[in-house]
């Protein structure tokens, strides 16, 4: 029975798309990682809680098949903000979020990152230069 569960999860992982624009935050990649952790021994893995495992699979399968989208249809494909799905994908991409974080940095933080030494030995040398200067 564990082999059947493993194969069902593998099939679900194969069908679940991975969004490359969401590096480190994508549900498909996270799902693959969790399945690999849960079934370390592949088909030979002993499932401690078979009912919970089956329930999790069914929940993920419903999400993947858009069960709730069909059960609760929306009259329009818009949101409160009026943005389209493509615009949301662009806004929520990792690159755009990094750009927003860069824009929100203070001038002082930007200067620190630009001119501060990056390697520990360079930091040590910079501090010794500053501390060894004679005070006037």
Curated annotation (Swiss-Prot):
Q: Which domain of life is it from?
A: Eukaryota
Protein name from the UniProt record: Ubiquinol-cytochrome-c reductase complex assembly factor 2
Chief localization: mitochondrion
Q: Which InterPro entries match?
A: UQCC2
Indicate the residues annotated as transit peptide: 1-13
Please give the GO cellular component terms listed in this UniProt entry: mitochondrial inner membrane; mitochondrial intermembrane space; mitochondrial matrix; mitochondrial nucleoid; mitochondrion
- Record keywords: Membrane, Mitochondrion, Mitochondrion inner membrane, Mitochondrion nucleoid, Transit peptide
Q: How does it assemble?
A: Interacts with UQCC1.
């Amino acid at each position: 029975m564990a082999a059947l569960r493993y194969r069902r999860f593998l099939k679900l992982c194969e069908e679940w798309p991975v969004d490359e624009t969401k590096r480190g935050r994508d549900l498909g990649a996270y799902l693959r990682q969790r399945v690999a952790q849960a079934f370390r021994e592949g088909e030979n893995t002993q499932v401690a809680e078979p009912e919970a495992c089956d329930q999790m699979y069914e929940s993920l399968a419903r999400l993947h098949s858009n069960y709730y989208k069909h059960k609760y249809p929306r009259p329009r494909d818009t949101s409160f903000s009026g943005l389209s799905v493509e615009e949301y994908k662009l806004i929520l991409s990792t690159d755009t979020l990094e750009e927003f974080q860069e824009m929100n940095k203070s001038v002082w933080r930007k200067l620190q990152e630009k001119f501060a030494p990056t390697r520990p030995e360079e930091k040590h040398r910079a501090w010794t230069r500053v501390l060894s200067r004679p005070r006037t």
